[in-house]
């Protein structure tokens, strides 16, 4: 149960953390949160993403017994906050959250694949998708192998 929540949260925070740092590159530009369509659009992507993960035999065993409604709320808040939205994420750091889980690189990559499928399904623009995914590589060491 905890494994599911932590891995998915890890991906969301990884993606969202990078977005927060990238969105301020151009003063006066619309926030990534707004460009993504706000909380409703983020929620739709997260719902689809969770469905992809649940159907993914490479990683779904990590999420058996997870509190899915809570997981979705947490992911939405993480992405919302990190992309410049009005939400607040109060969860643990990626290192804390993944300590002792021994997340494998292949599992991390599978989660990223599932997120990309959702972003593509909702026709997220190339710039926004790049911002969301750009930080994944940098955060990977905080998640994989902990």
Language-model features: locations:
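Bacterial N-terminal signal peptides that target proteins for export
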Residues: 1-11
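C-terminal motif of bacterial Sec signal peptides marking the signal peptidase cleavage site
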Residues: 15-18
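Bacterial signal peptide processing site
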Residues: 20-23
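Post-signal peptide N-terminal segment of mature Sec-exported envelope proteins
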Residues: 25-52, 73
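A ubiquitous short alpha-helical element
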Residues: 30-36, 62-64, 96-104
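Extracellular zinc-dependent metalloprotease catalytic-domain scaffold
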Residues: 51, 133-134
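N-terminal, post-signal-peptide region of Sec/Tat-exported proteins
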Residues: 51-79
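Compact alpha-helical subdomains of small soluble proteins
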Residues: 68-129, 135-142
């Amino acid at each position: 149960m905890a494994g599911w929540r932590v891995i998915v949260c890890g991906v969301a925070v990884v993606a969202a953390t990078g977005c927060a740092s990238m969105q301020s590159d151009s003063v006066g530009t619309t926030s990534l949160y707004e460009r993504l369509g706000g909380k409703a659009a983020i929620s739709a992507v997260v719902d689809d993403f969770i469905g992809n993960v649940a159907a993914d035999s490479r990683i779904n065993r990590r999420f058996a017994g997870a509190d899915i409604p809570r997981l979705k709320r947490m992911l939405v808040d993480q992405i919302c906050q990190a992309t410049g939205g009005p939400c607040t994420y109060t969860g643990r750091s990626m290192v804390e959250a993944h300590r002792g889980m021994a997340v494998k690189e292949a599992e991390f990559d599978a989660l990223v694949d599932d997120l990309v499928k959702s972003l593509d399904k909702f026709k997220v623009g190339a710039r926004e998708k790049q911002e969301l995914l750009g930080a994944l590589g940098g955060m990977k060491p905080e998640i994989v192998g902990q």
